[in-house]
Amino acid sequence: MNKKSLNIVVMFGILMILAFSGCVDQNASESTSEDTTPKILKIFHAGSLAVPFGEYESLYEAEYPNVDVQREAAGSVACVRKITELNKTAEILASADYTLIPDMMMPDYADWYVMVAKNEIVIAYTENSQYYDEITTENWYEIFQRGGVKYGFSSPNDDPCGYRTQMVVQLAETAYGDSTIYDDLMLENSNFEVDENADGTYLVRSPASIEVNEEKVFMRSKEVDLLGPLETGAFDYLFIYKSVANQHNLSYIELPAEINLGSYANADDYAKASIILEGQNSTILAKPIVYGMTVPSNAEDYEEGVNFVKTVLENPDVFENAGQPVISPAIAVGNVPDELSDLVTMG
């Protein structure tokens, strides 16, 4: 073989090696890319769970780095409707009112749930709020009626905090011995209606399209959408969960146990008020505030959802640190997955 032929053979060999090497590198790169693409775990949760669930997201992703937790916060009713009406999927549904799960999701979209935490309603304010240095647990409804004072709450049609606000104000009439409180604060400033029954119970009617007097009332879809406007002085007082007020370092007054929806001992008092969401044909009875979670039946990765619930149940201190009294062990109802059975008590 002459020198020229030898050079050709050598060059051909080098080219073959490089080509083969490129194929290997490309395949390895593709394989590595496939192996490192994170799984998505989608969560629809109540706005008031933003702080604790942000912590649970960090915990879960630290333990399972191949999982990308993606959270969508909204009013709990809106969260449920994403699944039941808009055909969206999520691995976790976490509601500020656990009863939305049996009432709106079972049996078609869920067959179990766990009750994990509690809360109560308070009235938050800032130093920019009118008469902030005068308002008390005893006189808040009188302060609200003063000229120029504006109060806020979330939409009952989207958010449990919104319909709970209506219940709180209605229950206040009995607690304070003043039968005009709901009339003065709500009926005169919105198109809500209320039925007073012969047995002493009340049914608030929330229309499909809510209208409010914007000179007195500031309303948004969910309660956390109201925090910024409160802090900038767009309105004076906000009906909000105690945990959220604490998380955002807001001043607040507490309400009597007879109306704040935070006391199991007063469950019979709460049951005197209810609300119908007329656009959804859904009636909700006032009851102590309890948060619930489930993995929707149509979740794309059901087992990953169950594993996330397990992480929540194994770390109840996250709720406590966020100012939400935890239910430990959690109370479970329905066909609870075996992986969770040692972490719950059946209700």
Swiss-Prot record:
GO terms for molecular function: molybdate ion binding; tungstate binding. Belongs to the bacterial solute-binding protein 1 family. WtpA subfamily. Residues 1-21 form the signal peptide. Keywords: Signal. The lineage of its organism: Archaea, Methanobacteriati, Methanobacteriota, Methanomada group, Methanococci. GO terms for biological process: molybdate ion transport. Gene3D superfamilies: Periplasmic binding protein-like II (3.40.190.10). It comes from Methanococcus maripaludis (strain C5 / ATCC BAA-1333). This is Uncharacterized solute-binding protein MmarC5_1756. It comes from the Archaea.
